[in-house]
């Protein structure tokens, strides 16, 4: 089940939970999406500022598996 988080502070609290398994970072032209997988929900945070996204990426917990997903060209 997906859930959206609006605040960066709430996202960091969620990422530090013990049931958080991994974080996927999806980069677009206009925004960056951080998706943290917990046991029940997939929490998503959308950031439009690239500098804030880099700061958030560096402040993620070190024990968490971080995976960066690049945009693929599905329609050619």
UniProtKB/Swiss-Prot annotation:
Keywords for this protein: Ribonucleoprotein, Ribosomal protein
Domain of life, per lineage: Eukaryota
Keyword Ribonucleoprotein appears in the UniProt entry: yes
Recorded GO MF terms: structural constituent of ribosome
Example GO BP: protein-RNA complex assembly
A GO CC annotation given for this chain: cytosolic large ribosomal subunit
PANTHER family xrefs: 60S RIBOSOMAL PROTEIN L38, LARGE RIBOSOMAL SUBUNIT PROTEIN EL38
Family from the record: Belongs to the eukaryotic ribosomal protein eL38 family.
Name of the protein in its database record: Large ribosomal subunit protein eL38
């Amino acid at each position: 089940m997906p859930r959206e988080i609006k605040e960066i502070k709430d996202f960091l609290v969620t990422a530090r939970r013990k049931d958080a398994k991994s974080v996927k970072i999806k980069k677009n032209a206009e925004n960056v999406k951080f998706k943290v997988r917990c046991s029940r929900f997939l929490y998503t945070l959308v950031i439009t500022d690239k500098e804030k996204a880099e700061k958030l990426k560096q402040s993620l917990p070190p024990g968490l598996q971080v995976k960066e997903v690049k945009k693929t060209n599905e329609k050619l």
